């Protein structure tokens, strides 16, 4: 249902950080591109991938420097189908940003996290609390700050 906020409860879900998608979309020459691509294909085939709305908006913001308004809106709407993943809590353009308590974000920042990383961590904790994995190339930014196991795409593929 469009606009409906959801909380993911599946146990074997992989929450994917924005940097994984940015490598796929913009950095085909990156040394991790092949592994990154295999990871995204596996997650799509298993239908176990989730991205937080916060991360999707970060991706759109990065792409905004190279895409026009129409392209950005099309990308935003097409993103979940392109990667066969779910956007949580909602992808509706009429939805509100995830409701998060300032205290929860501050608690994460006291663990030495940037505001953007704290938003991601708090969003995952609130809306995807039973995620098994948080998959990122910036493992050092998230390890010890999430309930999910923090792994790189390469580590996920070895499981």
Please provide the spans of the model-predicted regions:
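Acidic, PIN/NYN-like endoribonuclease modules and their adjacent C-terminal/linker elements
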Residues: 1-11, 121-159
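Short, well-structured N-terminal submotif of metal-dependent ribonuclease cores
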Residues: 1-51, 64-73, 144
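Alpha-helix capping/helix-boundary segments
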Residues: 20, 55, 119-120, 140-141
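Conserved beta-strand segments of alpha/beta enzyme cores
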Residues: 48, 84-86, 149
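Helix-adjacent hinge/juxtasegments
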Residues: 62-93
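Active-site neighborhoods of divalent-metal-dependent phosphate/nucleic-acid chemistry enzymes
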Residues: 86-139
């Amino acid at each position: 249902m469009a606009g409906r906020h959801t909380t993911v409860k599946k146990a074997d879900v992989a929450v994917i950080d924005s940097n994984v998608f940015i490598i796929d979309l913009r950095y085909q020459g990156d040394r991790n591109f092949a592994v990154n691509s295999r990871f995204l294909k596996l997650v799509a085939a298993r239908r176990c991938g989730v991205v937080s709305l916060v991360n999707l908006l970060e991706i759109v913001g990065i792409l905004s420097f190279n895409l026009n308004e129409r392209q950005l809106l099309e990308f935003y709407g097409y993103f979940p189908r392109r990667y066969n993943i779910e956007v949580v809590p909602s992808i509706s353009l009429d939805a509100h940003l995830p409701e998060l308590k300032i205290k929860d974000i501050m608690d994460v920042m006291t663990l030495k996290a940037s505001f953007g990383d704290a938003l991601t961590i708090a969003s995952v904790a609130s809306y995807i609390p039973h995620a098994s994995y948080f998959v990122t190339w910036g493992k050092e930014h998230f390890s010890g700050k999430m309930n999910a196991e923090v792994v790189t795409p390469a580590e996920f593929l070895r499981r």
